Amino acid sequence: MTRRDFIGTAGATSTLLQAAAAPNTEDRRNITTGWPIPKEGYVDQPYVVITNDGKWLCVLTTGSGVEGKPGQHIVATISSDQGRTWSSLIDIEPANGPEASWVMPLKTPYGRVYVFYTYNKDNLREVAGCNSPALAKRVDTLGYYAYKYSDDHGRTWSHDRYYIPMRRMRIDRENLYAGKVLFFWGVGKPIIDRGRAYFGFAKVGKWGNPGTMVQSQGCFMRSDNILTERDPNKINWILLPDGDEGLRAPKGPVSDEANPVALSDGSLYATYRTVDGYNCHAYSRDGGHTWTPPAYATYAPLGRRIKHSRAANFVKKFSNGKFLLWYHNHGGESIHAGKWEPYANRNPAWIAGGIEKDSHIYWSEPEILLYDLDPATRMSYPDFIEENGKFYVTETQKTIARVHEIDRSLLEGAWNQRDNRTVAPGGVILEPPFAMPRLPSLSGGGFTLDFRIRFRELSPNQVILDNREASGKGIAVTLTDRATLHLSLHDGRLRSEWESDAGTGPGTLEVGKWHHVAVIVDGGPNIITWIIDGVLNDGGAVREFGWGRFNPKMEDINGTPTAKVAPALFGELRKLRVYDRYLRTSEVIGNFHAG
């Protein structure tokens, strides 16, 4: 027997397992299934609080033009049915006044709702000295930190507005106005912990090109009495962190949109975005006065970095003490090798589930939360709502904002990944003569291949699975000359392909090691992902993306009824399962842990 003839199939049984659930005709992850939130034209940051009368109060920034145009202002709307329908818009600040933007709500225990926002109080019409004539006309990210309140659950708002004193820092003194005009905006929705309220925001230094907010640092406001003090003139405020510097990135000049949560021991954890190809995180153990040094966010302490573009990367804590991170799962060092558009590729939205351990957050491998069939859609600025055991998320694409109910099992799966030892149901384990189960059309359907493999060498052109016809129609999994696994899809008309990560990092191939491998073909967002040894490939050091899109026009990729399984493999293959559905990341990790 030559090495080309050898294949190990230990543990193979030909059993069709019961399907996990009946097919779902509506994919909740598709953003078009959500419920629209009213707006004027442009719409941003649809943030929700549940008021003491049981209704949802959503506040948002809107305007008849595009982002940053005159007439941009802040409004409220109310829902009595968990976001399915909404009231007419209620002005908090009018469209005919100075720009009012980036509104964030806080509900006090006694029922008052405050909103905090950037207000162009002095009605400046141009940013002097800006290097872009177009951006010089944009005056929605400067002025004063203002707030108003409502004592009737958002139906009416105080006539008076109040202002938070803002301590100048180095980044302010170095702006175009030497700190006499402040540039800032906030997206870090207020949180409450131990009788204090916090919210996050970014101070802006240089304004203009490239990127509009050329320099920024993360900061926080804290009030120790806003939850009980009913005279808004007596509310105290502390700008954090102490000193002259805010939260910064390890390399680049951008540290935007700090977003805080509280840990069980009173520590604070914050995420913020950069232009470095990763998001950042920081911990404070003293109520926000000081923070850990600049560091890219990692899935676990000293673990691999979380790739992310210049987009919202929000963290949320739920009543069960667990966390959720919204991000976009691409970036890395490879972005610096060529031209990169940091504001692009906000579709799909990914989440990681977080658990607290030893005063740190450990993040799960990512899952797709939301997608749009148009890759250019840019969904962002979410808010998460929890009510009566159900979970919801809001998001905006700048011209449409929606509410979505989240499948609770998606979140539970992410939170429980580390302990999951269950084999995902619905798989067929192939055994001789390797009759290939029929796969669904990729037009809305999907499939997963799941197997264990050990290579004696990583030479190219090894074949793990192949059911292609002479015309090429079918699927194949092979090994490339980069020591990566390669999936080929062909429906007789169109061909798509994607391969696993190269290199030596987590989720890559080694000689002599048993690997658990899954490749997921998801016909909802039309995305292929590789998961190797419980690590969802993120592109590693070489690629910006570890996940790839396949042609959305692909349909029937069934090839020959009998597959060739390991006809040219220098190694062993075990437990090759074929699923006629996409598996969630958490299901694949359950298979990995199950052994």
Model-based region annotation:
Residues 16-17, 21, 64, 94-95, ...:
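A short acidic/small-residue loop/turn micro-motif
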